């Protein structure tokens, strides 16, 4: 059992019927969907990048253009997240690009 501050969570990622939580060097799984989590997380801090991942915007290290108008986000700690084209537009609006 973990009690984790939301600020230390880098990302949530689908893993079968579970969601994997990335923080520090831990990756526990919880029996919740990303849709369930997305409704409960602060949208100013957490962003649904694609069908498989929700990222913590405070852990974003850099952003690069990617294929077909989408973007790739490089997270502190080494994770790379491909943002879907649809979510790329939302991300640009959110970040005021």
Ranges and model annotations:
Residues 1-82:
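Conserved binding/recognition cores within well-folded domains
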């Amino acid at each position: 059992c973990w009690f984790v501050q939301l600020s230390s969570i880098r990302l949530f990622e689908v893993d079968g019927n579970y969601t994997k939580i990335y923080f520090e060097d831990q990756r526990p799984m919880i029996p919740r969907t990303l849709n369930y989590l997305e409704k409960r997380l602060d949208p100013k801090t957490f962003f649904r990048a694609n069908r498989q991942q929700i990222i913590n915007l405070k852990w974003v290290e850099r952003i690069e253009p990617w294929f077909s108008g989408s973007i790739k986000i490089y997270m502190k700690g080494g994770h790379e997240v491909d943002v879907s084209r649809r979510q790329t537009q939302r991300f640009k609006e959110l970040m005021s690009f």
